[in-house]
């Protein structure tokens, strides 16, 4: 089965500023990834081809990195992404005097993974990416101008994940 998920946002900024935001991804001064409310994107080295890592239980490696333009990640066959065969990427494109910021997932998977994607991963992913684009817009504006609301489903899923994490931590502490 095919998974195709696309988010884009027209950002009122210059290509140079957008490029520096993309290039900060997963670094100590990350201005794109919404690590304030989501697991941080981390790699075993700097953002560059071959670096391995991910965010939370989603594992991937950097397949291609074109500074200031595009970062392509290939899912690893482990963690929550096990069963997703494909890529996801961020891309910056000049557009009508602004910048179009894009995030795309293109993957294939079996039925079980597709169900997991549809009911659990996709709603969380969608909220995370919208939070990332909000972070960029707010940073550029220098104030809070955009704040996407999480759906009741996203709030429920985040609550269930947090409860599971607390139970696992209690077991390890015992």
Model-derived regions: residue spans:
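Beta-strand/loop substructures that line and gate deep hydrophobic ligand-binding cavities in soluble
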Residues: 77-138, 145-149
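Hydrophobic pocket/interface hotspot
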Residues: 17-28, 62, 73, 101-103, ...
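Hydrophobic ligand-binding cavity/cleft-lining segments
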Residues: 1-44, 160-174
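Short, charged/polar surface micro-motifs in flexible loops or helix N-caps
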Residues: 27, 54-58, 64-71
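Short, surface-exposed coil-to-beta transition loops
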Residues: 4-6, 55-60, 83-89
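A short, structured loop/turn motif at beta-sheet edges
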Residues: 11-16, 63-69, 91-102
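Hydrophobic secondary-structure block in the mid-to-C-terminal portion of proteins
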Residues: 138-174
